[in-house]
Amino acid sequence: MVRGVIPAAFLTVAGLCGVPIVLPLSLLPVDEPGARLTWALTWALVPVLSLMASIMRVANHRFYTPDDIDGSGLTVGTSRVVILRAIAQNTLEQAVLAVAAYSIWAAAMPRSWLRAIPIAASLFVTGRILFARGYDRGAAGRAMGFGLTAYPTFVMLAALSIVLTYRAVNWVLGR
């Protein structure tokens, strides 16, 4: 498992720290709340579409598999649909965190830091593909995909927690 998470952590750090090289400031939205939120929500479409793809995989499988057509509420389900549902559930969990992180990031962070959002979204979809492809191989097969999906969001949420706590403390202290 470590073999998958270490490269994912490295790619996350490289992506988020190297983003100024990849994405010039001129491509960012104007520094206005509506434009910032539009930027975040545009990129939030990537995790949402990843979730849609996961749901579609479950639906397509059910449509073509008589043992699974009745749905999870009425049948136990084949091992394949159980795996597809687990992937969809994990994608839902990751997408909720990512969309929240992108939105809060866009509202709270300096304009130049908005470049992190498209990198995080790109890593998200790459991670979801690798996670789904590796799922059958257990934790080691999922590790890289999970890391690429989760780590950018976790880093963003941790940074937001630090920045917003710092701002709140300064506000309370009257600075």
Where are these regions (language model features)?
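Long, highly hydrophobic alpha-helical transmembrane signal-anchor segments
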Residues: 1-51
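Transmembrane alpha-helical segments of integral membrane proteins
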Residues: 22-25, 122-138
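Core segments of transmembrane alpha-helices
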Residues: 48, 89-102
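Membrane-helix interface/capping segments
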Residues: 53-78
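Short membrane-interface loop/juxtamembrane segments of multi-pass integral membrane proteins
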Residues: 70-94
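Hydrophobic alpha-helical transmembrane segments and immediately flanking/interface helices
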Residues: 101-129
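Interfacial loop-to-transmembrane junctions
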Residues: 130-155
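Juxtamembrane boundary at the C-terminal end of a transmembrane helix
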Residues: 158-175
